[in-house]
Curated annotation (Swiss-Prot):
Descriptive protein name: Adrenodoxin, mitochondrial
Subcellular location as annotated: Mitochondrion matrix
GO cellular component terms, A-Z: mitochondrial matrix; mitochondrion
Coiled coil start-end: none
Needed cofactors: [2Fe-2S] cluster
Role of this protein: Essential for the synthesis of various steroid hormones. Participates in the reduction of mitochondrial cytochrome P450 for steroidogenesis. Transfers electrons from adrenodoxin reductase to CYP11A1, a cytochrome P450 that catalyzes cholesterol side-chain cleavage. Does not form a ternary complex with adrenodoxin reductase and CYP11A1 but shuttles between the two enzymes to transfer electrons.
Source superkingdom: Eukaryota
């Protein structure tokens, strides 16, 4: 079994803080799709986004844009994010109080970061992937302008945009109830 250490940046400790995280399992450190690192977890493998400290970690306020989130309760949460960061990163890094948002931490395994975009912004977004589309099919309140926040990275053209959080959240990871189909072993 392989064991490697992964150097990761910790947003909670500040932009320049670094810590080491052990990777264990037969596939530890193997590269997966898109250059992600596969983490061995109890015999199962899970993809994790690789984090690196780059020039954008020390970006100036000129590289930040303003984003307005209309929360489920109708209140507007205004914050700033770095160009290149995903909307999920913006919510996490700014500790925005959006209940249940980003439960899978951006691994395309839930749909809790479902957002609804303004027409003029939606038209400029990169094409949706099949994987994102599959997750969106499970989202609550799906519209023709829906996307997952973990898949949308900020650009300068998005400055001052408003995105709406749907009224309810559906976590695709909880859509299958195995308890009802399980038989009791005696």
């Amino acid at each position: 079994m392989a064991v490697r250490l992964l150097r990761v940046a910790s947003a909670a400790l500040g932009d320049t803080a670094v810590r080491w995280q052990p990777l264990v399992g037969p596939r530890a450190g193997n590269r997966g799709p898109g250059g992600s690192i596969w983490l061995g977890l109890g015999g199962r493998a899970a993809a994790a986004r690789t984090l690196s400290l780059s020039a954008r970690a020390w970006s100036s306020s000129e590289d930040k844009i303003t984003v307005h989130f209309i929360n489920r309760d109708g209140k507007t949460l205004t914050t700033q994010g770095k160009v290149g960061d995903s909307l999920l990163d913006v919510v996490i890094e700014n500790n925005l109080d959006i209940d249940g948002f980003g439960a899978c931490e951006g691994t395309l395994a839930c749909s809790t970061c479902h957002l609804i975009f303004e027409d003029h912004i939606f038209e400029k977004l990169e094409a949706i992937t099949d994987e994102e589309n599959d997750m969106l099919d499970l989202a609550y309140g799906l519209t023709d302008r829906s996307r997952l926040g973990c898949q949308i990275c900020l650009t300068k053209a998005m400055d001052n945009m408003t995105v709406r959080v749907p009224e309810a959240v559906a976590d695709a990871r909880e859509s299958i109830d195995l308890g009802k189909n399980s038989s009791k072993l005696e």
